[in-house]
Amino acid sequence: MRALGIDPGTATMGWGVVERDGGVLRLVDVGALTTPAGMPQPERLLQLYNGLRAIIERLQPDTAAVEELFFGKNVNTALTVGQARGVALLALAQAGIPVYEYKPTAVKQAVAGYGGADKRQMQEMVRLTLGLATVPRPDDAADALAIAICHAYTAPTLQRFGVS
């Protein structure tokens, strides 16, 4: 199984692809799509969409996982992240890729074994899980890999119970 994880954002959208062969996970590729500050929002969303479509075409994931929207105190941030999520969901749906969504606490629980893990703990667990020499950068890319790892661990159980 080849899983694409996406950490949505309009300034930076992290993405990471892992492959699971039996019980072994390996990194396929990781990165981040960025848009310039000051770029009009519709153009930012189009740039993210086109970038994500190119990644999907190049890496051919079987499945995808996107972090669910977390409503913090900043409503404007939540709205723009929601728009970026919509772009990601659209690109994945158009490519016919099944999409799963995970709450941040579920990702932390799956990757670090603790739903309250902090960012540094998560990044270190991503590094260790994939046998990497360093933590992927930027942070959004490491977050996207955590989402992909969460899905790679969770997908067999979902399939066993017929959840799609």
Swiss-Prot record:
One family name in Pfam for this protein: RuvC
Active site: 7, 67, 140
Entry binding sites for Mg(2+) 1: 7, 140
Major location (coarse): cytoplasm
Catalytic activity line of the entry: Endonucleolytic cleavage at a junction such as a reciprocal single-stranded crossover between two homologous DNA duplexes (Holliday junction)
Enzyme class per UniProt: hydrolase
Keywords of the record: Cytoplasm, DNA damage, DNA recombination, DNA repair, DNA-binding, Endonuclease, Hydrolase, Magnesium, Metal-binding, Nuclease
GO cellular component: cytoplasm; Holliday junction resolvase complex
The record's free-text note on cofactor binding: Binds 2 Mg(2+) ion per subunit.
Cofactor(s) the protein requires to work: Mg(2+)
InterPro entries linked to this entry: RNaseH-like_sf (IPR012337), RNaseH_sf (IPR036397), X-over_junc_endoDNase_Mg_BS (IPR020563), X-over_junc_endoDNase_RuvC (IPR002176)
Molecular function GO terms recorded: crossover junction DNA endonuclease activity; DNA binding; magnesium ion binding
Keyword Nuclease: yes
Cellular localisation: Cytoplasm
UniProt xrefs under CDD domains: RuvC
EC number of the protein: 3.1.21.10
Example of a GO biological process term: DNA repair
Residues the record lists as binding Mg(2+) 2: 67
Similarity comment: Belongs to the RuvC family.
PANTHER family, sorted: CROSSOVER JUNCTION ENDODEOXYRIBONUCLEASE RUVC
Function: The RuvA-RuvB-RuvC complex processes Holliday junction (HJ) DNA during genetic recombination and DNA repair. Endonuclease that resolves HJ intermediates. Cleaves cruciform DNA by making single-stranded nicks across the HJ at symmetrical positions within the homologous arms, yielding a 5'-phosphate and a 3'-hydroxyl group; requires a central core of homology in the junction. The consensus cleavage sequence is 5'-(A/T)TT(C/G)-3'. Cleavage occurs on the 3'-side of the TT dinucleotide at the point of strand exchange.
Subunit structure and binding partners: Homodimer which binds Holliday junction (HJ) DNA. The HJ becomes 2-fold symmetrical on binding to RuvC with unstacked arms; it has a different conformation from HJ DNA in complex with RuvA. In the full resolvosome a probable DNA-RuvA(4)-RuvB(12)-RuvC(2) complex forms which resolves the HJ.
Listed name of the protein: Crossover junction endodeoxyribonuclease RuvC
